[in-house]
Amino acid sequence: MSTKRLNSKHIHAHMKSAFNYADCSTAEKLKVGCVLVKDDRIISIGYNGMPPGWSNTCETLSFFNEFGKQLPTQVLVTKPEVLHAEENAITKLARSTESGEGATAFITHAPCLSCAKLLYSSGIVEVYYVHEYRDTAGIYFLNQCKIGVNQFADN
């Protein structure tokens, strides 16, 4: 496990990198970025988007929301195939020679429960995020796992 602590200047830089990678997303509704750092070195990055080789269109117009509820007008609905930023970062990490053991995740938005489970299972020991997610189950899970969770003030 990594014992090297990040200083405030580097925390800001890595969080800024997460936002820069979020800008690479082709999603229209929400752009999310994730940077995995170990020993103050980036070991993987990810942003939300379609799987490799698929069309880069992350949403579709629909009269139904993500939960199947009918709506009076069409709205943009995220396609179920879209990978979250954390999923992309972790799958890239899995294909590398690096390990997530002892790493820190910098994410533009708090992780959902599924991504929180992936972060924990990958050995991530600390998570920084700026924006809340629509539910707090992911943060609750990370806290239960004794993962350091820090909401970063957006300056």
What is each stretch, according to the model?
Residues 1-155:
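Zinc-dependent deaminase catalytic domain
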